[in-house]
């Protein structure tokens, strides 16, 4: 009985709870709340009597709240859709850019990536942009529908010719245009400039070829000396670095500090063994600079050796190749005569070159003018000294010739010079007529062959020039013309005289020919011509 009562009470309670809970109807678009998943409580449960009790203001507020709630739910749904769409968008674009960056790293890895030693590196690449690639990039940037595969192919074809950055890229362009290294072009232009300067300044006409070649050899030797010293220094420095790398195992052994026991042990071991001390070699490499291993004398010796032996090496190499090619097609029995003929040809060439050495001076440039033979009038002035004002640092062959005294000449000197030049010209032309030929026009060697005549006392008539202030040995133009006429008139009578008298007269005139010499003797003139003496050009 009690059990039945308990069962009835439980059923009543269950039915009461079931009446409170609403039935969930998803098809009810008005009362079903999709956000919470429950049914809204309806206000129509109490019957028509309760609906009549609700005021119209409360119903409008409930409708407004429902609209706001729905708006919030819709906004939340839109945001969730946008986020989902962005995730899908990123999931499609990330692989494209991942592959693009991976390609850049692969191309840069071939040339070298930055590390601890090189913080940053620069690379150069060419960008190839086609029309299809441009359209795919524009679609991606504008947010239109795009295809990941097409964009991936477009980005993969953009970068080509990936290479390291070079700050001297202009050299590449220069070589592409001209096909020549700029350094070689500079050296060729420098040589052309030297040739232009040599020709334009006419140095080759002022300086002898022998002097030019000598200077070229000296300059080449000095340049080779500096060149060989730098080469030897670099070789010594490289050897020094290699020795330091080989002494690396002794760093810990030789660099540590030793006390007196360690130094004593080192001395004991070095005294009882013939092995070299590695620490000595180690400290020599650390202290001695390689520059002290290349003295100038070593560079000088090597330069002189190369200056002499290098040309001989090339000559010997060429001669060996020539003999090898010559003997290749000649039978063995004829090789010995051919070698003998070659030896004779070389000896004859050397002999001919030695004989032709004196002839080479004609190619050395303009020779100096040989000393001119002294004319009879010049022997009268042999007390005058020549002085030369050289120019051109020993290369130019010009000088100024004049007397040892004052450079300026007086009127008598100019007159005497004009007379001397006219007479010398007639003498060399072969015109030896009695009208122009004088004793002072003959060479001294011819005059010395005649017997000497003892001169007599000077005539007082011949010293009138000294009293009037004129120079001895000179006469006025009037006296010279009169004397010439007198002599021309006396030539027939002189032709009848004996040869001995003529020679004596020539000897006497030649002795009076120098300036300031003795005047002709009156007795000698009378003995020669039988008439009174007249003025002569020499006195």
Swiss-Prot record:
Keyword Ion transport: yes
Residue numbers of Phosphoserine PTMs: 429, 433, 459, 498, 513, 521
Distribution of this protein across tissues and organs: Expressed in cerebellum (at protein level).
Subcellular location: Endoplasmic reticulum membrane
Main location: endoplasmic reticulum
Residue(s) at site: Ca(2+)-mediated inhibition of channel activity: 25, 181
Gene Ontology CC: chloride channel complex; endoplasmic reticulum membrane; mitochondria-associated endoplasmic reticulum membrane contact site
Family: Belongs to the chloride channel MCLC family.
Full protein name: Chloride channel CLIC-like protein 1
Gene: Clcc1
